[in-house]
């Protein structure tokens, strides 16, 4: 089933949220007066322009966004992922999954330019040991694992899946735990599946368990795991009682029991991306829009713990992004947070951590990633 992101939003009932009052997208300010100056530099990262069939490779050099190269994808792209060893980039398209080798931010297509799987992966991630590519196709009630060679990035055998499949085909996003022992799949109104994963087994998947949505009218859009495997995060719609009803649900990883105080308000309608900060002190949620604006909003939370009891507190300020923000990434230096936006003229925003207010994000870059509309729909960074 060939399915673009717009089609998935239609099927999950999310596209009606995207209407704007003026020309579909709200207007963006062209002023850069709100930008903070920085001299910091980042690692390499890759932005996927879905509408223009491009992967753009970037890094930040002393505060300046620097383009490495632009690559035309073999067919209409959907998503991408970088392997933890930073040697390979995997590209999901309507024609299947391709693999590229990475060298100093430059890409070279591998496997003689052919696909390594015919699956139209909507979401994917490589396991921490680089041995499996986990991927799922929206519209198919399953999640797949492709065994990989850690030296070539190519498949070494047939793909595997849970014996029972998944209880829902409304696939939104997947995540692999940092230790590689669980796979999580956000399945829209079908809730979130968690599956034990044993890399050394011929079929690494265990039995599927489902966490239902907080509200019967809600949908699980995003999922992520704390870098130290303390907490599991799920972003859902219709999870709070405010007009901006998006919620961040938080579970203790060891028991998958929900924290007191969860769900936490995200300040927007559709929590499309969750970014646990690499140091483990903060977590950020990108809302694609709010009840009053198509401008994306990033909500930040501070994580506290006492005797293995965890709590989150919202930062006093939130952080604006671009039009319909859909994905976040942290760079390999742990100094930058990047956001991509599918609408408007600023396809990419970059932030650094504020030097005074712990965890706050200061916007330092706002830029197009091509001749708009490009639909910058995914981002992946070198680890």
List where the protein language model places each region.
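A short beta-strand motif characteristic of beta-propeller blades
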Residues: 64-72, 108-116, 157-165, 206-215, ...
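Short loop/turn segments immediately following beta-strands, especially the blade-tip
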Residues: 57-64, 100-107, 145-154, 194-205, ...
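Repeated scaffold domains used in trafficking and secretory/extracellular systems
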Residues: 76-81, 119-126, 168-175, 218-224, ...
